[in-house]
């Protein structure tokens, strides 16, 4: 039986993309991921995450990271909620890695509702396939090694993209999270000098809006 784990990195930042990681393996190999030492990516050092990401890709039957740019997020938010965007983004990973069982980190206060939306979204597109089982849980990256692995791939990819932004911009933008003093300082300085934000910024975020208004 094929199983897939899905998790996101970068849902909350004001700078940079959101990355949705997916890892597919045979269910009887899930212990191999656990033995690698995968854990929630937030608890690992960047160096350890990079090392584990390479190992995960070797063990996985398939893997995929779906990226949603700041501009895409801004445009979609004109039409739908962030939860709706998460359903679409997770759905894109499921499309890439179809499986018998789907473990997802719930991106909704009601975890069952998020799982049902993922299921309905998939079955609407594939009415003739055997229905997958969907397990949607808060903290799934702590509960299921396959989701921990997906979390690591998502975080490593976002970290790579943030580092590229720093190089391209020639300035330290920090982590991109609204609470980061370096990020706030970058936004303040950039807007003061340019009266607008570059496309690396999510203009629809309150952190950015307070400068624009």
Curated annotation (Swiss-Prot):
> One GO CC term of this entry?
cytoplasm
Q: Name one Pfam family in it.
A: RNase_HII
Cofactor(s) this protein cannot do without = Mn(2+); Mg(2+)
**Which residues are recorded as binding a divalent metal cation?**
7-8, 105
**What's the catalysed reaction?**
Endonucleolytic cleavage to 5'-phosphomonoester
Subcellular location(s): the record lists: Cytoplasm
Q: What is written in the cofactor note of this entry?
A: Manganese or magnesium. Binds 1 divalent metal ion per monomer in the absence of substrate. May bind a second metal ion after substrate binding.
- EC numbers listed for it are 3.1.26.4
Q: Which GO terms describe its biological process?
A: DNA replication, removal of RNA primer; mismatch repair
Mind listing the GO molecular function terms for this protein?
A: manganese ion binding; RNA binding; RNA-DNA hybrid ribonuclease activity
Its biological purpose is as follows: Endonuclease that specifically degrades the RNA of RNA-DNA hybrids.
Family, similarity comment:
Belongs to the RNase HII family.
Q: Which NCBIfam families match?
A: ribonuclease HII (TIGR00729)
Report the protein name in the record.
Ribonuclease HII
Origin species, per record, is Methanococcoides burtonii (strain DSM 6242 / NBRC 107633 / OCM 468 / ACE-M)
Originating gene: rnhB
């Amino acid at each position: 039986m094929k199983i897939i784990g899905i998790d996101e990195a970068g849902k909350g930042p004001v700078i940079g993309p959101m990355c949705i990681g997916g890892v597919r393996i045979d269910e009887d190999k899930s212990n191999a991921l656990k033995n690698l030492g995968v854990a929630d990516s937030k608890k690992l050092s960047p160096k350890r995450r990079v090392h584990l990401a390479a190992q995960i890709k070797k063990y996985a039957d398939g893997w995929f990271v779906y990226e949603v740019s700041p501009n895409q997020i801004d445009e979609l938010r004109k039409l739908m909620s962030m939860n709706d965007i998460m359903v679409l983004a997770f759905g894109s990973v499921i499309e890439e890695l179809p499986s018998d069982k789907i473990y997802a980190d719930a991106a909704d206060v009601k975890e069952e509702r998020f799982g049902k939306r993922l299921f309905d979204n998939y079955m609407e597109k594939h009415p003739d396939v055997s229905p997958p089982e969907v397990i949607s849980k808060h903290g799934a990256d702590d509960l299921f090694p396959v989701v921990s692995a997906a979390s690591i791939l998502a975080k490593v990819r976002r970290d790579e993209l943030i580092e590229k932004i720093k190089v391209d911009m020639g300035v330290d933008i920090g982590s991109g999270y609204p609470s980061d003093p370096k990020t706030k300082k970058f936004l303040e300085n950039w807007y003061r000098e340019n009266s607008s934000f570059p496309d690396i910024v999510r203009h629809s975020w309150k952190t950015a809006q307070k400068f624009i208004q």
